[in-house]
Amino acid sequence: MVPVLIFFGATASGKTSLASEIFSYKHSKDFSKEGGISALSACAEIISADSVQVYKHMHIGSASPSKEELEDLPHHLIAIKEPSEEFSAADFVKEADKLCPEIYRRGKLPVLMGGTAFFLKNFLYGLPVTPTADPKIREHFQKRAKEEGAGILLEELKKIDPETAERLHVHDEYRIIRAHEVFAASGKPLSSFALPENPREKYEFFILSIERTRSLLYERIEKRVDAMFAEGLYDEVKKLYEMGYTSESPGLKAIGYREFFDENKRLKPESDLEEVSALIKRNTKHYAKRQETFFKTIPDVHRYFIEDKAEISRLYKDICGFYKKLLK
């Protein structure tokens, strides 16, 4: 059985910096001292469970790890897809299932880290068995989305599968179409195809969630968005637009990118950046709230309120204890 650490936190909660502090090679001696384990086994590799960091050319808006963080701690599934390509939960589970045993064979701990709840939940429980995609049905709904807009399809979805429609955003065209596909093929709503009740038995999971007070999390979101603009987020989006990517590209439907485009899919002018920034902050806060709500539905989660130094110490010790499984 392969031990896997799931490291979850809402956007802007500080996952990347905390993971770098805990798992990087430069801190391995501290791990050895704290947990009574060798420096060699006190190393991990990160599997990014972030649906935006998977895309190339989107470093700033996705808050991807810095060059120094990537050099110090191995990361996987970062910048592996073009913004025009889809990357689904099934794709993530397939890739993570290959990576976890490989990392474990190297004597390291696989750490799934991110905030894309859909990725993590499907990896934890396994994918629900849904009807195979029918290319003709998919093409039909893709054509309708292009001609009528995904908003029309989402409104229709509310009538046949309100549970799925409730958790989808109008920009999530891929999943809106998939929900229609499933209903058209089976006559059943996608929400009726439930995940298995228990976590997959091929892994031994340690699930942790880093948490902050809502007010401080929102403050961090405000500061991070400001920092992204200062770092050159507009130029990053402009370059993507010049490369031929638009708000219809899967990668650019993400929060932090879609707000830069008007209703005609044109890039907004620099004079609108104040409004764009406000939209990104608002949408990111709403997303963070949904992330927190979602993760409360997962049982057996170890929660750490990292504004308290004692909680960070407890987190550190708990991870060290889980690391010992590598030596068995």
Curated annotation (Swiss-Prot):
GO terms for molecular function: ATP binding; tRNA dimethylallyltransferase activity. SUPFAM superfamilies: P-loop containing nucleoside triphosphate hydrolases. Keywords: ATP-binding, Magnesium, Nucleotide-binding, Transferase, tRNA processing. The record marks 116, 138 as: Interaction with substrate tRNA. GO terms for biological process: tRNA modification. It comes from the Bacteria. Disulfide bonds: none annotated. Substrate binds at residues 11-16. It catalyses: adenosine(37) in tRNA + dimethylallyl diphosphate = N(6)-dimethylallyladenosine(37) in tRNA + diphosphate. Pfam families: IPPT (PF01715). InterPro entries: Dimethylallyltransferase (IPR039657), IPT (IPR018022), P-loop_NTPase (IPR027417). The keyword Nucleotide-binding applies. ATP binds at residues 9-16. Its cofactor is Mg(2+). It is an enzyme of class 2 (transferase). Residues 50-53 are annotated as: Interaction with substrate tRNA. Catalyzes the transfer of a dimethylallyl group onto the adenine at position 37 in tRNAs that read codons beginning with uridine, leading to the formation of N6-(dimethylallyl)adenosine (i(6)A). Belongs to the IPP transferase family. Monomer. This is tRNA dimethylallyltransferase 1. The gene is miaA1.
